[in-house]
Amino acid sequence: MERISFGAFLSPLHPLGEDPGLSLWRDLELAEWLDQFGYEELWVGEHHSAGWGTISSPELFIATAAERTRRIRLGTGVVSLPYHHPFMVASRAVQLDHLTGGRFTLGVGAGSIPSDMHFLGIDPADTRRRTAESLDVIHRLLTGDEPVTRVTDWFELHDARLQLRPRRASGLPLAVSSAVSPFGMRLAGQYGAAPLSFGVPPRPGSSVDDLAAQWQHAVDSAAEHGRTIDRADWRVALSVHVADSREQALDDLVDGWMRYRNEYWALLGTPPVHSRTEARKALAELIDRRSTIVGSVDECIDAVRDVQEATGGFGRLLVNVLDWADREAMKRSFELFARFVAPRFNGSLDGVTASYGWVAEQARAQRAAAR
């Protein structure tokens, strides 16, 4: 299988009870940890209601995180296009491209929280049309030299062009999110953008195998529009927790996962669990079908390999940042993953392994010759 690189996806989703302002600073501290541990990307979401997701402007968060990190790439995960004028999205994206020294990726999507849409007077049935209209304009602004004029029922542009241009001649990296329907994957294929799949929803019958069909939608759309799309650019976001053993990992997670299931996903109609025993059983089922990756280092290596094979291959695995475990257990999980799981897939062990093997072979040959 092809190599995989690794990043993190920060919605964020913080359970009620903790000071929300302090949570923002803790999220910035997390960005520093990820940078130090060698994660290649951090994606930051946009939410405006429901209490758990409190980053309303991923661009502002990224501008701050860029000052506190050195290497990690930072992306909006995602800007909800129906909520914003497309010229402003494109203009701010290019500014971030410059402020981050070229470390920014513009991730876009249709939005997912009905209450956010209600606040803004947006019909949920209209979000896909708005997303497609907006992305067409954004793509033209970011890649073309001609002024853009476009009049719709929700935005207007007249002879619009960007003052700042992307830093690189190849343009500003662009990603499109996908959850369940083919819409996001087809849009990614249409523009040759990187698909960003939000893993597997916690509903009966869903499994990691569904992701393979998602990828095919992107391939088909790209072909229809005369473009190609590379699996190496496909991001897949999954929940991951590494501990010394599966039992320890479950102990770390079960209470936080139960709150997440019963409080956050309940808003979306997911049935609750009623005890820690029931929660452990439900969580174990998610692990067994690879919707969530939890366990020891070796178990997580096997699970990543299984997901890679089930999907047909992808380029980047994004670890969901969820407050299921306490702070220290979460930090240790990210560190264990970076030290012992990621190297099995990103090629960083190839040189030292080959060198050790060569020296060992030479030593065996010398001992044999001395007999």
From Swiss-Prot:
Transmembrane segments: none
Disulfides per UniProt: none
Keyword set includes Flavoprotein: yes
Annotated EC: 1.14.13.-
Null mutant phenotype: Mutant accumulates 4-hydroxyprotoasukamycin.
GO terms assigned for molecular function: monooxygenase activity; oxidoreductase activity, acting on paired donors, with incorporation or reduction of molecular oxygen
Cofactor binding mode and count: Shows a preference for FMN. Activity with FAD or riboflavin is 3-fold lower.
Cellular component terms (Gene Ontology): cytosol
InterPro entries reported for this sequence: Bact_Lucif_Oxidored, Luciferase-like_dom, Luciferase-like_sf
First-tier enzyme category under EC: oxidoreductase
One family name in Pfam for this protein: Bac_luciferase
Pathway the protein acts in: Antibiotic biosynthesis
Keyword Flavoprotein: yes
Gene Ontology annotations of biological process type: antibiotic biosynthetic process
Keywords, sorted A to Z: Antibiotic biosynthesis, Flavoprotein, FMN, Monooxygenase, NAD, Oxidoreductase
Cofactor(s) required for function per UniProt: FMN
UniProt catalytic activity: 4-hydroxyprotoasukamycin + NADH + O2 + H(+) = asukamycin + NAD(+) + H2O
UniProt family annotation: Belongs to the bacterial luciferase oxidoreductase family.
Function field: Involved in the biosynthesis of the antibiotic asukamycin. Catalyzes the epoxidation of 4-hydroxyprotoasukamycin to the final product, asukamycin. Can also convert some 4-hydroxyprotoasukamycin derivatives to their asukamycin derivatives, but cannot use protoasukamycin as substrate. Can also use NADPH, but catalytic efficiency is 20-fold higher with NADH.
Name of the featured protein: 4-hydroxyprotoasukamycin monooxygenase
Taxonomic classification: Bacteria, Bacillati, Actinomycetota, Actinomycetes, Kitasatosporales
Gene for this chain: asuE3
